[in-house]
Amino acid sequence: MRNPHSAFPQRFKFFPISPFSCRLHEANCWSWWRLGLLGFVFLLAGCNGTFSHYKEVDHSLKAGNPDKAVTLIQEAEDDYGRKNRLLYLMDEGMVLHLAGRYEESNTVLEEAYLLVEELYTTRLRDQASAILINETQLPFEGEPFEHVLINVIMGLNYALLQNWNEALVEARRIDHRLNVLSDRVEGDAYKEDPFARYLTGVLYEIAGDLNNAYVAYRKAETIYDETQSWSKMPLPDGLKTDLMRVADILHLSEDLEEYRTKYPEMVDEVPLPYDADMAQLIVVSYHGRSPKKEDLFIDVPISLDALALVALAKSVGGQSTRSNREGEALIYGIHGQIARVALPRLVPQHTKIAYSTIQLTDGTTTFDARSQRVYDIDAVAEKNLDDEYATLVLRAVARTAMKMAAAEGIGIGARSAVSKNSQDWVGLVAVILARIFVLMTEEADIRSWRTLPGEIHLTRLWIPAGSYNLMVNAVDRQGRVIGQPNTDQLDFRSGEVRLLLRQYLE
């Protein structure tokens, strides 16, 4: 007679009990498979933990050691893994940017940009594993606003290198990305970005392309107004003055008069006619840290005693987290009438800083300005999450329903397999272990670009050519200076434009 084991590939023969021998040795079989399934539960529960290096990265950046942050990210490359390749590139590119290693940053972010383009066209997703386990089994694709910010950071890198031609390439890429979004996205979902449009205008203007700069400024004005309900960003005063200045340079007298009427409070802030011999300092300030995502576990009891058990678990253990879910999964799995759904929620990391003060002095004359908030990443991240929340809820509910049904099916199958020997405990153990597996592997996708700031501020200051001492201070919401002033000595030629970057994590 043909050996039934021969039908199985050689790689399956390491199992002490094969599937074919289950019918002959039910007790031993289910002991082995019970232990194997339990081990698999704990293995998978530990596979999708959060990245622990972020705390050390934040500490290094706050201590003023961005190169250490770069090292920490690079050392964690294997922890990111293949499915999180895009996230790794975004994190590495950002910390290189903060470390002043702008060329290296752009090399990394260019790879991220190309990977996003590939994801846009192929959408390579292992949907089956996501449905059976959780969303973290999918390759990280990033949010639409994060895709836009890849090119924003690259554009800033080139501007910091004073490579204005390449900066314009990034401005055009930003335009293209937002135009594609506008074509694909319907309704009031995120499809435009006010700061990205504003930055393209700044880059066009510095490069001497005033017509495109003016178009970008006008578009940014419209988008700031249209998105204020969710971007939480009023129209920056700097953009108002930019519109007046460029309208005057282009001899658009009607437009200039329109803006003077529209923004009378800014008329005295725009010295006209514009003096092309004036040098310009642009300071981009990063304040705080971007919001992080956490799991929101929703336990759904389907009986009164299950409701009482959930209430008891919450009163003892508090809010469910990834660190305490094992005990709950064990209790709920034994009970059998409690389902769990995991959804992401944003946790803002609000900055203490209200603004920065910028002061330039040549020994006799002092020029000063206050930074203006031009981008609230907390608000934009919240908008992106809100846009996809209905879909996330539907997928999470469907996933939980399928997994719970599969768990019950395992119990039925196990009981059927051993019914001849009346070993009902085998089916009970199997279904309990399957439920525990379902509960422990349910988690939300909380991956995000956490090395971004919480806010971006922009300052533009026009000065005569010469040598200056620079002092930048961070000011909190009570008007108090935080930390030590950031100082530098700068020399400006006639008509020169220089961009500086400052970061404050408080």
Q: What is each residue range found by the language model?
A:
Residues 48-51:
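Bacterial signal peptide processing site
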